[in-house]
Amino acid sequence: MAGPVKDREAFQRLNFLYQAAHCVLAQDPENQALARFYCHTERTIAKRLVLRRDPSVKRTLCRGCSSLLVPGLTCTQRQRRCRGQRWTVQTCLTCQRSQRFLNDPGHLLWGDRPEAQLGNQADSKPLQPLPNTAHSISDHLPEEKMQIQGSSDQ
């Protein structure tokens, strides 16, 4: 069970702005400027408060003009092959900026991997404490005294 979320109100505001942009485009596809304003506001709030957004949300926003990327309406999607790998290329129709995403069914995003989950980190073996390399001066003094006394006897 998840604990309390830090900046819960900010995440709710981001969610509202993202949904509002979707609703505006769904009702009137010509009203892209208002949807872009909502997305730009959402992006600036997330940057100002240093909040990490989900990759699926970031992939639906243009990094150049903050437009909401809806295939066939505000962007084009093409499947390309490059060096044996399949890529999905999204091109924004407003600013012509393109983004490439790996189209591999076996690929997992970092957040979806088991080692990225906080619950699994607690299950792994605990970190071993580092050995104390700082020795006190008194640990070395008796050896030095013995060496000095032994050398003066000779």
UniProtKB/Swiss-Prot annotation:
<comment type="similarity">
    <text>Belongs to the eukaryotic/archaeal RNase P protein component 4 family.</text>
</comment>
<feature type="region of interest" description="Disordered">
    <location>
        <begin position="112"/>
        <end position="154"/>
    </location>
</feature>
<keyword id="KW-0862">Zinc</keyword>
<feature type="modified residue" description="N-acetylalanine">
    <location>
        <position position="2"/>
    </location>
</feature>
<feature type="binding site">
    <location>
        <position position="92"/>
    </location>
    <ligand>
        <name>Zn(2+)</name>
    </ligand>
</feature>
<comment type="subunit">
    <text>RNase P consists of a catalytic RNA moiety and about 10 protein subunits; POP1, POP4, POP5, POP7, RPP14, RPP21, RPP25, RPP30, RPP38 and RPP40. Within the RNase P complex, POP1, POP7 and RPP25 form the 'finger' subcomplex, POP5, RPP14, RPP40 and homodimeric RPP30 form the 'palm' subcomplex, and RPP21, POP4 and RPP38 form the 'wrist' subcomplex. All subunits of the RNase P complex interact with the catalytic RNA.</text>
</comment>
<keyword id="KW-0539">Nucleus</keyword>
<dbReference type="GO" id="GO:0004526">
    <property type="term" value="F:ribonuclease P activity"/>
</dbReference>
<dbReference type="Pfam" id="PF04032">
    <property type="entry name" value="Rpr2"/>
</dbReference>
<dbReference type="GO" id="GO:0046872">
    <property type="term" value="F:metal ion binding"/>
</dbReference>
<keyword id="KW-0479">Metal-binding</keyword>
<keyword id="KW-0819">tRNA processing</keyword>
<protein>
    <recommendedName>
        <fullName>Ribonuclease P protein subunit p21</fullName>
    </recommendedName>
</protein>
<feature type="binding site">
    <location>
        <position position="95"/>
    </location>
    <ligand>
        <name>Zn(2+)</name>
    </ligand>
</feature>
<dbReference type="GO" id="GO:0008033">
    <property type="term" value="P:tRNA processing"/>
</dbReference>
<comment type="function">
    <text>Component of ribonuclease P, a ribonucleoprotein complex that generates mature tRNA molecules by cleaving their 5'-ends.</text>
</comment>
<feature type="binding site">
    <location>
        <position position="62"/>
    </location>
    <ligand>
        <name>Zn(2+)</name>
    </ligand>
</feature>
<dbReference type="GO" id="GO:0005655">
    <property type="term" value="C:nucleolar ribonuclease P complex"/>
</dbReference>
<feature type="compositionally biased region" description="Basic and acidic residues">
    <location>
        <begin position="137"/>
        <end position="146"/>
    </location>
</feature>
<dbReference type="InterPro" id="IPR007175">
    <property type="entry name" value="Rpr2/Snm1/Rpp21"/>
</dbReference>
<keyword id="KW-0007">Acetylation</keyword>
<feature type="binding site">
    <location>
        <position position="65"/>
    </location>
    <ligand>
        <name>Zn(2+)</name>
    </ligand>
</feature>
